[in-house]
Amino acid sequence: AEAERLVHRWFTLEDPARLEPAERELFVEAEVDGLVLRGYVDRLDVSADGAMRVVDYKTGRSPSELFERSSLFQMRFYALVLWRARGVIPRMLQLVYLGNGELVRYEPDEADLLATERGIKALWAAIERAARTGDWRPRVSRLCDWCEHRDLCPAWGGTPPPLPLDAPTRALDPSVAGQAAPADD
């Protein structure tokens, strides 16, 4: 019933018979200063003049204006990866919120994507620093109210489990990142 409601809502927002996506579930990847960025774009539309529109579907409701900018990070990330991989900045980023039928559209520019790139590089530098030092400081926010791991979080008096000895290598070495840890003997 819920899936049917979401499909019906999608049909009220877009006429699928008129859509001719260039790509669906498109794997995107680019390297930025040695950092490999990758993800999956729900839908990529390309117009006759080559302009790209990146579309992402969300089953939930659109965020309030207070959180809208952070919800666009994923879309700016996709735009950055496409720009670096294809040499063209997408003209339009579009979030489709099927939960309440809202469309959020954003037109990125080079300055915006360069700022996104700087932010990603700074985040990765912080991850590298934490992996090398073992200093993973929690950041308390309202999202903690929904977290299932508060009992393990130092910010809430919890004790995290010890990291495997090879955790920094597994996190930072691209040749092993994302692979399962070897089984204990």
Predicted regions and their residues:
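A non-catalytic, helix-rich entry segment at domain boundaries
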Residues: 1-24, 31
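Short, surface-exposed helix-loop/turn micro-motifs enriched in polar/charged residues
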Residues: 16-20, 66-70, 87, 135-139
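Short linear motifs at secondary-structure transitions and domain/linker junctions
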Residues: 1-2, 17-21, 68-72, 119-124, ...
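Alpha-helical scaffold segments in carbohydrate-active enzymes
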Residues: 5-9, 77, 81, 149-152
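A generic secondary-structure signal marking the coil-to-beta-strand transition
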Residues: 20-21, 51, 143
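Mg2+/Mn2+-dependent nuclease catalytic core
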Residues: 26-122
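Metal-dependent nuclease catalytic regions and adjoining charged, substrate-binding loops involved
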Residues: 82-185
